[in-house]
Curated annotation (Swiss-Prot):
Cross-referenced CDD domains: RHOD
Active-site feature positions: C142 (cysteine persulfide intermediate)
Highest classification ranks of the organism: Eukaryota, Viridiplantae, Streptophyta, Embryophyta, Tracheophyta
Biological processes per GO annotation: response to jasmonic acid; response to oxidative stress; response to wounding
GO cellular component annotations of the record: chloroplast; thylakoid
Keyword list, A-Z: Chloroplast, Plastid, Thylakoid, Transit peptide
Name of protein: Rhodanese-like domain-containing protein 15, chloroplastic
Domain Rhodanese residue range list: 82-182
Length: 182
């Protein structure tokens, strides 16, 4: 199925086939949508991005399907979850992890440094599955909170059910003087 990006803001970025109707139209899905393709909808009516995959029916109505978005919590809440039995998955690079990491964290890199850039770890899901079961309670952290959010989204999409992203990552963890190992 071909997918179209459907954005409620005027700034589309590099999305091909993107359309940007006024926000009031998007809330009710009254705008004209392509009838034979999927549509990604960004709902910006509140402060959190809520992405949905929507498809049009034979009558042109839109049926929306929610895409799983990870829950993000502050580091102090993440620490409480770890104390309550959640396991910590650190998705930073091995070099970042070796400098220091939260106590009892397991490192499975989401990305690897290659030259001056980064590439996604092609074995990420398989490696995570070797340490965790799909229903394990897992908190996921990275350096600043961005990579862990992407990793959390991938894990939810892969069927993991108890995923919690750590907002602010290891930087916030150390700023709050939470326990680390070196």
């Amino acid at each position: 199925m071909e997918t179209t990006a459907f954005n409620t803001t005027s700034r589309i970025g590099n999305w091909s086939s993107a359309i940007s109707p006024p926000l009031q139209t998007c809330g009710s899905f009254k705008c004209q949508l392509p009838t034979r393709r999927g549509v990604i909808v960004a709902d910006l009516r509140n402060s959190n991005f809520r992405w949905r995959k929507a498809t049009t029916t034979s009558r042109g109505n839109v049926a929306a399907e929610a895409v799983k978005i990870p829950t993000s919590v502050p580091v102090r809440v993440a620490r409480e979850l770890a104390q309550a039995g959640y396991r910590y998955l650190d998705v930073r690079t091995p070099d970042e992890f070796s400098i220091g990491h939260p106590t009892r964290a397991i490192n499975v890199p989401y990305m690897y440094r290659v030259g001056s850039g980064m590439v996604k770890n092609p074995s990420f899901l398989r490696q995570v599955s070797s340490h965790f079961r799909k229903h394990d309670e897992i908190i996921i952290g990275c350096e600043s909170g961005q990579m862990s959010f992407m990793a959390s989204t991938d894990l939810l999409t892969a069927g993991f059910t108890a995923i919690t992203d750590i907002a602010g990552g290891y930087v916030a963890w150390t700023e709050n003087e939470l326990p680390v190992e070196e």
